[in-house]
Amino acid sequence: MEEKFRNLIEVWISALISLSYCYYISSKLSKGVLRLLSILPVCILFLVLPLFLSCVHFCAISVLFLSWLANFKLLLFAFDEGPLFPLPPKLSRFICFACLPIKIRQDPSPNAIPNLHPKPMPKWVLAVKILVLGVLLHVYEYRDGLPRFVVLALYCLHIYLEVELVLVFVGAVVSTLLGCNIEPVFNEPYLATSLQDFWSRRWNLMVSAVLRSTVHIPVQRFFKRILSPDGAMFAGVMASFFVSGLMHELLYFYMIRKPPTWEVTCFFVLHGAATATEIAVKRTQWLRPPHRAVSGLVVLTFVSVTGVWLFLAQVLRNNVHEKAIGECLLVLDLAKLFTSS
Protein backbone atom coordinates (compact mmCIF):
# COMPACT_ATOMS: atom_id res chain seq x y z
CA MET A 1 0.00 0.00 0.00
CA GLU A 2 2.92 2.31 0.71
CA GLU A 3 4.09 1.97 -2.90
CA LYS A 4 0.60 2.83 -4.17
CA PHE A 5 0.56 6.03 -2.13
CA ARG A 6 4.05 6.92 -3.35
CA ASN A 7 2.97 6.44 -6.97
CA LEU A 8 -0.10 8.60 -6.35
CA ILE A 9 2.02 11.39 -4.89
CA GLU A 10 4.47 11.24 -7.81
CA VAL A 11 1.62 11.34 -10.34
CA TRP A 12 0.02 14.38 -8.76
CA ILE A 13 3.30 16.22 -8.29
CA SER A 14 3.85 15.79 -12.03
CA ALA A 15 0.33 17.05 -12.67
CA LEU A 16 0.79 20.12 -10.46
CA ILE A 17 4.07 21.01 -12.19
CA SER A 18 2.39 20.63 -15.59
CA LEU A 19 -0.54 22.84 -14.62
CA SER A 20 1.87 25.44 -13.24
CA TYR A 21 3.57 25.46 -16.65
CA CYS A 22 0.20 26.06 -18.32
CA TYR A 23 -0.54 28.90 -15.91
CA TYR A 24 2.79 30.71 -16.17
CA ILE A 25 3.89 29.88 -19.74
CA SER A 26 0.99 28.77 -21.95
CA SER A 27 -1.30 31.54 -20.71
CA LYS A 28 1.19 34.14 -21.97
CA LEU A 29 0.91 32.85 -25.55
CA SER A 30 -1.75 34.10 -27.91
CA LYS A 31 -4.91 32.02 -28.00
CA GLY A 32 -5.35 29.51 -30.78
CA VAL A 33 -2.91 27.14 -32.42
CA LEU A 34 0.21 28.42 -30.65
CA ARG A 35 -1.25 28.01 -27.16
CA LEU A 36 -2.78 24.68 -28.15
CA LEU A 37 0.61 23.35 -29.26
CA SER A 38 2.11 24.39 -25.92
CA ILE A 39 -0.66 22.59 -24.02
CA LEU A 40 -0.74 19.34 -26.05
CA PRO A 41 2.33 17.80 -24.29
CA VAL A 42 0.54 18.30 -20.97
CA CYS A 43 -2.60 16.64 -22.33
CA ILE A 44 -0.55 13.67 -23.51
CA LEU A 45 1.15 13.44 -20.11
CA PHE A 46 -2.24 13.43 -18.39
CA LEU A 47 -3.20 10.43 -20.54
CA VAL A 48 -0.04 8.58 -19.46
CA LEU A 49 0.06 9.34 -15.72
CA PRO A 50 -2.83 7.03 -14.67
CA LEU A 51 -0.89 4.06 -16.07
CA PHE A 52 1.40 4.32 -13.04
CA LEU A 53 -1.51 3.69 -10.64
CA SER A 54 -2.75 0.19 -9.80
CA CYS A 55 -5.21 1.08 -7.02
CA VAL A 56 -8.74 1.16 -8.51
CA HIS A 57 -9.82 4.28 -6.62
CA PHE A 58 -6.59 6.22 -7.17
CA CYS A 59 -6.65 5.33 -10.86
CA ALA A 60 -10.33 6.16 -11.42
CA ILE A 61 -10.09 9.51 -9.63
CA SER A 62 -6.91 10.48 -11.48
CA VAL A 63 -8.42 9.55 -14.85
CA LEU A 64 -11.51 11.65 -14.15
CA PHE A 65 -9.58 14.65 -12.84
CA LEU A 66 -6.58 14.62 -15.20
CA SER A 67 -7.25 12.58 -18.36
CA TRP A 68 -10.82 13.83 -18.71
CA LEU A 69 -11.61 17.09 -16.93
CA ALA A 70 -8.18 18.73 -17.04
CA ASN A 71 -7.56 17.80 -20.68
CA PHE A 72 -10.96 19.03 -21.84
CA LYS A 73 -10.68 22.28 -19.86
CA LEU A 74 -7.14 22.91 -21.13
CA LEU A 75 -8.33 22.44 -24.71
CA LEU A 76 -10.99 25.06 -24.09
CA PHE A 77 -8.41 27.30 -22.40
CA ALA A 78 -6.27 27.19 -25.55
CA PHE A 79 -9.01 29.20 -27.28
CA ASP A 80 -9.96 31.43 -24.31
CA GLU A 81 -13.04 29.38 -23.54
CA GLY A 82 -14.30 27.43 -20.56
CA PRO A 83 -13.84 27.81 -16.79
CA LEU A 84 -10.14 28.75 -17.06
CA PHE A 85 -10.95 31.95 -18.95
CA PRO A 86 -10.48 34.63 -17.84
CA LEU A 87 -7.27 33.45 -16.21
CA PRO A 88 -7.77 33.03 -12.43
CA PRO A 89 -5.70 35.51 -10.39
CA LYS A 90 -3.97 32.77 -8.38
CA LEU A 91 -2.24 29.53 -9.39
CA SER A 92 -4.14 27.61 -6.71
CA ARG A 93 -7.47 28.57 -8.28
CA PHE A 94 -6.24 27.72 -11.75
CA ILE A 95 -5.18 24.25 -10.61
CA CYS A 96 -8.47 23.61 -8.80
CA PHE A 97 -10.62 24.82 -11.68
CA ALA A 98 -8.51 22.90 -14.22
CA CYS A 99 -8.59 19.40 -12.80
CA LEU A 100 -11.40 19.25 -10.24
CA PRO A 101 -15.15 18.95 -10.88
CA ILE A 102 -15.96 22.28 -9.27
CA LYS A 103 -17.72 25.49 -10.19
CA ILE A 104 -18.20 28.55 -8.00
CA ARG A 105 -21.81 28.77 -6.92
CA GLN A 106 -23.70 31.77 -8.27
CA ASP A 107 -26.90 33.10 -6.76
CA PRO A 108 -29.68 32.08 -9.19
CA SER A 109 -32.20 34.61 -10.43
CA PRO A 110 -35.76 34.40 -9.02
CA ASN A 111 -37.02 33.07 -12.37
CA ALA A 112 -34.37 30.34 -12.67
CA ILE A 113 -35.42 26.73 -13.16
CA PRO A 114 -34.84 24.95 -9.80
CA ASN A 115 -33.20 21.83 -11.23
CA LEU A 116 -30.65 23.96 -13.08
CA HIS A 117 -29.48 25.43 -9.76
CA PRO A 118 -29.44 22.53 -7.29
CA LYS A 119 -29.21 23.33 -3.62
CA PRO A 120 -26.32 22.08 -1.48
CA MET A 121 -26.92 18.70 0.09
CA PRO A 122 -28.37 18.97 3.63
CA LYS A 123 -26.07 17.56 6.29
CA TRP A 124 -28.61 14.96 7.39
CA VAL A 125 -28.89 13.65 3.82
CA LEU A 126 -25.10 13.42 3.62
CA ALA A 127 -25.04 11.51 6.92
CA VAL A 128 -27.69 9.09 5.67
CA LYS A 129 -25.75 8.41 2.47
CA ILE A 130 -22.53 7.76 4.39
CA LEU A 131 -24.43 5.39 6.68
CA VAL A 132 -26.00 3.57 3.72
CA LEU A 133 -22.60 3.13 2.07
CA GLY A 134 -21.19 1.73 5.31
CA VAL A 135 -24.09 -0.72 5.60
CA LEU A 136 -23.57 -1.74 1.97
CA LEU A 137 -19.94 -2.62 2.60
CA HIS A 138 -20.94 -4.87 5.49
CA VAL A 139 -23.77 -6.49 3.50
CA TYR A 140 -21.22 -7.56 0.88
CA GLU A 141 -19.94 -10.13 3.37
CA TYR A 142 -23.24 -11.99 2.92
CA ARG A 143 -23.76 -11.40 -0.79
CA ASP A 144 -23.17 -15.06 -1.70
CA GLY A 145 -26.52 -15.84 -0.09
CA LEU A 146 -28.40 -13.02 -1.80
CA PRO A 147 -30.27 -13.23 -5.12
CA ARG A 148 -28.22 -12.13 -8.12
CA PHE A 149 -30.47 -9.18 -8.98
CA VAL A 150 -30.20 -7.86 -5.40
CA VAL A 151 -26.39 -7.99 -5.54
CA LEU A 152 -26.38 -6.16 -8.88
CA ALA A 153 -28.71 -3.50 -7.46
CA LEU A 154 -26.32 -3.07 -4.54
CA TYR A 155 -23.42 -2.57 -6.97
CA CYS A 156 -25.36 0.18 -8.79
CA LEU A 157 -26.20 1.89 -5.51
CA HIS A 158 -22.58 1.57 -4.36
CA ILE A 159 -21.24 3.27 -7.51
CA TYR A 160 -23.64 6.18 -7.14
CA LEU A 161 -22.99 6.71 -3.43
CA GLU A 162 -19.22 6.40 -3.64
CA VAL A 163 -18.85 8.70 -6.66
CA GLU A 164 -21.08 11.33 -5.10
CA LEU A 165 -19.48 11.17 -1.64
CA VAL A 166 -15.95 11.39 -3.05
CA LEU A 167 -16.86 14.44 -5.14
CA VAL A 168 -18.73 16.04 -2.22
CA PHE A 169 -15.61 15.59 -0.08
CA VAL A 170 -13.41 17.14 -2.79
CA GLY A 171 -15.82 20.05 -3.15
CA ALA A 172 -15.89 20.63 0.62
CA VAL A 173 -12.09 20.71 0.82
CA VAL A 174 -11.79 23.10 -2.13
CA SER A 175 -14.58 25.31 -0.79
CA THR A 176 -12.72 25.62 2.52
CA LEU A 177 -9.34 26.27 0.91
CA LEU A 178 -10.60 28.84 -1.61
CA GLY A 179 -13.16 30.44 0.68
CA CYS A 180 -16.06 30.18 -1.77
CA ASN A 181 -19.25 28.20 -2.25
CA ILE A 182 -19.12 25.33 -4.75
CA GLU A 183 -21.95 24.10 -6.96
CA PRO A 184 -23.21 20.60 -6.05
CA VAL A 185 -21.95 17.94 -8.45
CA PHE A 186 -25.04 15.74 -8.10
CA ASN A 187 -28.68 16.71 -7.76
CA GLU A 188 -30.40 13.60 -6.37
CA PRO A 189 -30.42 11.60 -9.64
CA TYR A 190 -32.85 9.04 -8.21
CA LEU A 191 -35.53 11.77 -8.44
CA ALA A 192 -35.11 12.17 -12.22
CA THR A 193 -38.35 12.14 -14.20
CA SER A 194 -36.78 11.74 -17.65
CA LEU A 195 -33.48 10.75 -19.21
CA GLN A 196 -32.87 14.37 -20.17
CA ASP A 197 -33.47 15.36 -16.56
CA PHE A 198 -31.16 12.58 -15.33
CA TRP A 199 -28.19 13.29 -17.59
CA SER A 200 -28.47 17.09 -17.97
CA ARG A 201 -29.62 18.26 -14.54
CA ARG A 202 -28.90 15.58 -11.97
CA TRP A 203 -25.99 13.21 -12.73
CA ASN A 204 -22.37 14.42 -12.48
CA LEU A 205 -23.20 17.99 -13.47
CA MET A 206 -19.62 19.20 -13.86
CA VAL A 207 -18.82 16.50 -16.44
CA SER A 208 -22.06 17.36 -18.25
CA ALA A 209 -21.02 21.02 -18.32
CA VAL A 210 -17.59 20.19 -19.75
CA LEU A 211 -19.10 17.93 -22.42
CA ARG A 212 -21.58 20.67 -23.30
CA SER A 213 -18.77 23.18 -23.86
CA THR A 214 -16.28 20.91 -25.64
CA VAL A 215 -18.58 18.64 -27.65
CA HIS A 216 -22.27 19.51 -27.74
CA ILE A 217 -22.07 23.21 -28.59
CA PRO A 218 -19.30 22.92 -31.26
CA VAL A 219 -21.02 19.95 -32.94
CA GLN A 220 -24.39 21.67 -32.87
CA ARG A 221 -22.87 24.85 -34.30
CA PHE A 222 -21.21 22.87 -37.12
CA PHE A 223 -24.32 20.89 -38.10
CA LYS A 224 -26.53 23.99 -38.14
CA ARG A 225 -24.97 24.71 -41.53
CA ILE A 226 -26.33 21.52 -43.08
CA LEU A 227 -29.22 20.42 -40.83
CA SER A 228 -32.29 21.96 -39.28
CA PRO A 229 -31.93 23.45 -35.77
CA ASP A 230 -33.52 20.33 -34.27
CA GLY A 231 -31.27 18.05 -36.32
CA ALA A 232 -28.18 19.97 -35.20
CA MET A 233 -29.30 19.74 -31.58
CA PHE A 234 -29.79 15.96 -31.85
CA ALA A 235 -26.34 15.63 -33.46
CA GLY A 236 -24.86 17.49 -30.48
CA VAL A 237 -26.65 15.19 -28.04
CA MET A 238 -25.42 12.03 -29.77
CA ALA A 239 -21.87 13.38 -30.05
CA SER A 240 -21.79 14.20 -26.32
CA PHE A 241 -22.93 10.72 -25.33
CA PHE A 242 -20.51 9.11 -27.77
CA VAL A 243 -17.53 11.05 -26.41
CA SER A 244 -18.64 10.23 -22.87
CA GLY A 245 -18.67 6.56 -23.85
CA LEU A 246 -15.14 6.81 -25.25
CA MET A 247 -13.88 8.45 -22.07
CA HIS A 248 -15.45 5.70 -19.97
CA GLU A 249 -13.77 3.12 -22.22
CA LEU A 250 -10.51 4.90 -21.47
CA LEU A 251 -11.30 4.79 -17.75
CA TYR A 252 -11.99 1.05 -17.93
CA PHE A 253 -8.78 0.47 -19.86
CA TYR A 254 -6.75 2.11 -17.10
CA MET A 255 -8.50 0.05 -14.42
CA ILE A 256 -8.59 -3.30 -16.25
CA ARG A 257 -5.52 -2.95 -18.52
CA LYS A 258 -7.23 -4.93 -21.29
CA PRO A 259 -8.38 -3.89 -24.79
CA PRO A 260 -11.81 -2.21 -24.83
CA THR A 261 -14.93 -4.26 -25.55
CA TRP A 262 -17.00 -1.14 -26.42
CA GLU A 263 -19.86 -2.21 -24.16
CA VAL A 264 -19.75 0.99 -22.13
CA THR A 265 -19.66 3.03 -25.36
CA CYS A 266 -22.79 1.17 -26.47
CA PHE A 267 -24.36 2.07 -23.12
CA PHE A 268 -23.88 5.79 -23.72
CA VAL A 269 -24.84 5.64 -27.40
CA LEU A 270 -28.03 3.82 -26.39
CA HIS A 271 -28.79 6.46 -23.78
CA GLY A 272 -27.99 9.21 -26.25
CA ALA A 273 -30.44 7.76 -28.76
CA ALA A 274 -33.07 7.27 -26.06
CA THR A 275 -32.61 10.81 -24.76
CA ALA A 276 -32.82 12.29 -28.27
CA THR A 277 -35.97 10.27 -28.94
CA GLU A 278 -37.46 11.41 -25.65
CA ILE A 279 -36.79 15.07 -26.51
CA ALA A 280 -38.30 14.62 -29.98
CA VAL A 281 -41.46 13.03 -28.56
CA LYS A 282 -41.82 15.83 -26.01
CA ARG A 283 -41.59 18.45 -28.76
CA THR A 284 -44.31 16.81 -30.84
CA GLN A 285 -46.63 16.78 -27.80
CA TRP A 286 -48.27 13.62 -29.12
CA LEU A 287 -48.34 11.97 -25.73
CA ARG A 288 -49.51 13.33 -22.43
CA PRO A 289 -46.63 13.34 -19.90
CA PRO A 290 -47.04 10.52 -17.35
CA HIS A 291 -47.16 11.11 -13.62
CA ARG A 292 -43.78 11.93 -12.06
CA ALA A 293 -43.81 8.72 -10.04
CA VAL A 294 -44.38 6.62 -13.16
CA SER A 295 -41.81 8.39 -15.33
CA GLY A 296 -39.29 8.34 -12.47
CA LEU A 297 -39.69 4.59 -12.02
CA VAL A 298 -39.30 4.03 -15.77
CA VAL A 299 -36.12 6.14 -15.87
CA LEU A 300 -34.52 4.39 -12.89
CA THR A 301 -35.43 0.98 -14.29
CA PHE A 302 -34.00 1.81 -17.71
CA VAL A 303 -30.78 3.22 -16.26
CA SER A 304 -30.35 0.28 -13.87
CA VAL A 305 -31.08 -2.48 -16.40
CA THR A 306 -28.90 -1.02 -19.15
CA GLY A 307 -26.25 -0.19 -16.56
CA VAL A 308 -25.98 -3.79 -15.40
CA TRP A 309 -26.16 -5.07 -18.98
CA LEU A 310 -23.58 -2.74 -20.58
CA PHE A 311 -22.00 -0.32 -18.09
CA LEU A 312 -20.96 -2.85 -15.45
CA ALA A 313 -20.23 -5.77 -17.79
CA GLN A 314 -16.47 -5.23 -18.04
CA VAL A 315 -16.17 -4.39 -14.35
CA LEU A 316 -17.92 -7.59 -13.25
CA ARG A 317 -16.21 -9.79 -15.83
CA ASN A 318 -12.74 -8.70 -14.69
CA ASN A 319 -13.56 -8.63 -10.95
CA VAL A 320 -12.73 -4.94 -10.66
CA HIS A 321 -15.65 -4.62 -8.25
CA GLU A 322 -14.05 -7.14 -5.88
CA LYS A 323 -10.84 -5.13 -5.87
CA ALA A 324 -12.72 -1.87 -5.29
CA ILE A 325 -14.75 -3.36 -2.43
CA GLY A 326 -11.55 -4.69 -0.88
CA GLU A 327 -10.02 -1.21 -1.00
CA CYS A 328 -13.11 0.27 0.69
CA LEU A 329 -13.01 -2.34 3.45
CA LEU A 330 -9.31 -1.63 3.95
CA VAL A 331 -10.08 2.07 4.44
CA LEU A 332 -12.75 1.15 7.01
CA ASP A 333 -10.30 -1.08 8.87
CA LEU A 334 -7.70 1.70 8.89
CA ALA A 335 -10.31 4.17 10.15
CA LYS A 336 -11.29 1.81 12.97
CA LEU A 337 -7.64 1.30 13.86
CA PHE A 338 -7.03 5.05 13.87
CA THR A 339 -10.07 5.87 16.03
CA SER A 340 -9.34 3.10 18.53
CA SER A 341 -5.71 4.12 19.05
From Swiss-Prot:
GO terms for cellular component: membrane. Its EC number is 2.3.1.75. One of its GO terms (biological process) is lipid metabolic process. Disulfide bonds: none annotated. It is found in: Membrane. Its main location: membrane. Keywords: Acyltransferase, Lipid biosynthesis, Lipid metabolism, Membrane, Transferase, Transmembrane, Transmembrane helix. It is a multi-pass membrane protein. GO terms for molecular function: long-chain-alcohol O-fatty-acyltransferase activity. Catalyzes the final step in the synthesis of long-chain linear esters (waxes). This is Probable long-chain-alcohol O-fatty-acyltransferase 1.
